[in-house]
Structure formats: structure tokens, C-alpha cells
């Protein structure tokens, strides 16, 4: 499909500050390797050498997955839409679904702007609204939107554009390069529902 997804394969580094987290990361890494996942288990000195800007005094080690990456959500959406259209799908934009049509426990279409659209397949791709739409037809979708906080720094000189996403589960924080700046995200153990 001729559209950029903004794919960056910078990898991901999960780090451990505690012995229990370090054991957990190594156990997960060993299991992942059994399934062919490319990864490297790094000790504190290897992390310091590979990422000299990072403070590592309190680390036990980490797991680097060099094949991990991130993509631009808008670009991915456009790529998927273009591919779907090429495959014969019809996309109705700015057309809120009023309800999903069911008969004998099976989905057979949707109602949009008072018009019933019959179809063989319905893809429920409504993100944080999926739970409410599923409830209308008796389908439980264990998903809800939650508050999420992040900050973006001013540009940082010498910040590598190939810095992996760094996840610190002990501190509930992640870091990633974003256009020469550092994006710092915080994830909560008990998320607050957004609505």
C-alpha cells in the first residue's frame, strides 16, 4: 500500500531495578526465545555501554528486543483503509453507527443514519467506544479508556533518533525519542477510567 506508516524499528529495552523484576524479565525472555523472538539479555554494564546517556546505578539489568518498533497511528489507519478499499471494502466516514444488526444471535449488518447496511462481516474498530457498542448487542468487551499522562521535553542535543523505547516497570514509566525530544509516559497500576 502506498502510504507511510511512520514505522520506526528502534527496538525496546525493558529494565529492572529490583531482583524480583530482574528474575521476571529473564524468565519472560527465556520463554520468548523458545518462540523465536530475537532479544538480548543485558547486564547493567552492557546497558551503560550501549546507552551512555542513561543513568544505570540502580539497575540490575534489562532485556533488549531490537526488532520492536512503533508506528504513526494516523499513517497506519490510512494504510489499512487504502488496503481495505483495494480489497473491495466500503468505508463510510462521518457516519456514526446507531446499532449493530443481529438476527438469531448473528451479526448481519449495521444501521447508519437510519439506513440498514447488510454485510457479511462487521469489524468493530471503535477503540474506546467498543465496550458500549458491544453492550448494545450483549457482547462483553473488557476494554475501557483510561487517563494516561506524558510529558515531552524540549529538544535534547545528541539524543539518538534510534533510541529504543525504554520501559521501567518498577517506576511505572517509559521513555522514547520523539522528533529530537524525549517523550516520558507514566502508566498507573490502577488506571482511572476516562468516563
Give the location of each predicted region.
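Active-site substrate-recognition segment that forms the wall
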Residues: 1-11, 99-107, 115-195
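Dinucleotide-binding Rossmann-like beta1-alpha1 core, especially the glycine-rich loop
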Residues: 1-50, 172-175, 179-183
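Short aromatic/hydrophobic contact patches that present stacked aromatics
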Residues: 12-16, 62-64, 150
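Residue-level signal for well-ordered alpha-helical positions
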Residues: 28, 53-54, 136-137
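Residue-level detector of anion-binding/catalytic polar loops
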Residues: 38, 90, 140
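FAD-binding beta-loop-beta segment adjacent to the flavin cofactor pocket
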Residues: 48-56, 102
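Helical element adjacent to the flavin cofactor pocket in flavoenzyme catalytic cores
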Residues: 58, 62-121, 125, 129
Amino acid at each position: 500500500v502506498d502510504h507511510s506508516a511512520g514505522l520506526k524499528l528502534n527496538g525496546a529495552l525493558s529494565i529492572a531495578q529490583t531482583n524480583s523484576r530482574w528474575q521476571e524479565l529473564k524468565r519472560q525472555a527465556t520463554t520468548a526465545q523458545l518462540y523465536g523472538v530475537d532479544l538480548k539479555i543485558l547486564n547493567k554494564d552492557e546497558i551503560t555501554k550501549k546507552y551512555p546517556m542513561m543513568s544505570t546505578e540502580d539497575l540490575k539489568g534489562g532485556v533488549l528486543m531490537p526488532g520492536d518498533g512503533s508506528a504513526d497511528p494516523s499513517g497506519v489507519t490510512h494504510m489499512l483503509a487504502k488496503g481495505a478499499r483495494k480489497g473491495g471494502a466500503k468505508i463510510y466516514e462521518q457516519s456514526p453507527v446507531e446499532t449493530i444488526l443481529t438476527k438469531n444471535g448473528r451479526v448481519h449488518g449495521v444501521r447508519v443514519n437510519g439506513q440498514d447496511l447488510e454485510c457479511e462481516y462487521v469489524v468493530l474498530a471503535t477503540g474506546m467506544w467498543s465496550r458500549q457498542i458491544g453492550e448494545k448487542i450483549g457482547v462483553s468487551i473488557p476494554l475501557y479508556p483510561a487517563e494516561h499522562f506524558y510529558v515531552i521535553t524540549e529538544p535534547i542535543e545528541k539524543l539518538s533518533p534510534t533510541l529504543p523505547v525504554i520501559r521501567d516497570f518498577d517506576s511505572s514509566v517509559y521513555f522514547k525519542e520523539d522528533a529530537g525530544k524525549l517523550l516520558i509516559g507514566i502508566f498507573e497500576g490502577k488506571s482511572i477510567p476516562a468516563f
